[in-house]
Amino acid sequence: MQVDLLSSAQSAHTLHLFHQHSPLVHCMTNDVVQTFTANTLLALGASPAMVIETEEASQFAAIASALLINVDTLTQPRAQAMRAAVEQAKSSQTPWTLDPVAVGALDYRRHFCHELLSFKPAAIRGNASEIMALAGIANGGRGVDTTDAAANAIPAAQTLARETGAIVVVTGVMDYVTDGRRTVGIHGGDPLMAKVVGTGCALSAVVAACCALPGDMLENVASACHWMKQAGERAVARSEGPGSFVPHFLDALWQLTQEVQA
């Protein structure tokens, strides 16, 4: 199984495109991470919007550059709004990304996520346990936490990508991004990133934004992983723990965008 590495030049090129296009991202995400997700997108130059009312969610999905569906704090009313948004996104050809949080541990969200797959997401982002569960290979994970190594989920990710047509992202110590044929690996980051709520959810929002960019979607999505890992490394070098990590992380994302414009 061949895994290619993303080049720094491609990552920088995609970040330049990101800043040029400033995608409007409709984030239907969980209650815990909304502020951090919005700030992450803003730091990179995107425009976030959190619209959750069913009628408005459908309407906004038609005008957004991209849509994110994150099922962490899923409720029946929220599922109804998400379903309406995804239906409209498909009709409007708005690329949408699925973050199937804890899909291997809980039945309701597993059934809901499988239902949404019929609406053809542009991308799916999860940890190893989530991707394996969504692919039907295993039911696992400890809530939102993975119990599997990212590399172990590559075959499941490739299968899921081929079956759905989505770019599939498996995050971990090393991230893997695949379209079912090509697989790209992204190294970097720091274990401290896992001690801050929302880094994975925010990545899903950046992945969604990258699906709206022109060019090679696989490389664009892989670039999103690279930026987050780069910013994480820089933030850890400047912080003393999780509390001071977040502002340094947002600053690091901003600095990355300034560097590609210099």
From Swiss-Prot:
GO annotation, biological process? thiamine biosynthetic process; thiamine diphosphate biosynthetic process
User: What does the record give as its pathway?
Assistant: Cofactor biosynthesis; thiamine diphosphate biosynthesis; 4-methyl-5-(2-phosphoethyl)-thiazole from 5-(2-hydroxyethyl)-4-methylthiazole: step 1/1
EC annotation from Swiss-Prot or TrEMBL: 2.7.1.50
Q: Where does substrate bind?
A: M50, G198
| Cofactor(s) the record lists | Mg(2+)
User: Catalytic activity annotated for this protein?
Assistant: 5-(2-hydroxyethyl)-4-methylthiazole + ATP = 4-methyl-5-(2-phosphooxyethyl)-thiazole + ADP + H(+)
In this chain, ATP is annotated as bound at R125, T171
Q: Which InterPro entries match?
A: Hyethyz_kinase, Ribokinase-like
Kindly give the CDD domains that the UniProt entry links to this protein: THZ_kinase
Q: Does the keyword Nucleotidyltransferase apply?
A: no
Q: Pfam families per the record?
A: HK
Q: Name one GO molecular function term.
A: hydroxyethylthiazole kinase activity
Keywords tagged on the record:
ATP-binding, Kinase, Magnesium, Metal-binding, Nucleotide-binding, Thiamine biosynthesis, Transferase
Q: Does the keyword rRNA-binding apply?
A: no
Family stated for the protein in its record: Belongs to the Thz kinase family.
Task of the protein: Catalyzes the phosphorylation of the hydroxyl group of 4-methyl-5-beta-hydroxyethylthiazole (THZ).
What is the protein name stated in its UniProt record? Answer: Hydroxyethylthiazole kinase
Q: Please name the source species.
A: Shigella dysenteriae serotype 1 (strain Sd197)
Q: What is the lineage of its organism?
A: Bacteria, Pseudomonadati, Pseudomonadota, Gammaproteobacteria, Enterobacterales
Q: Which gene encodes it?
A: thiM
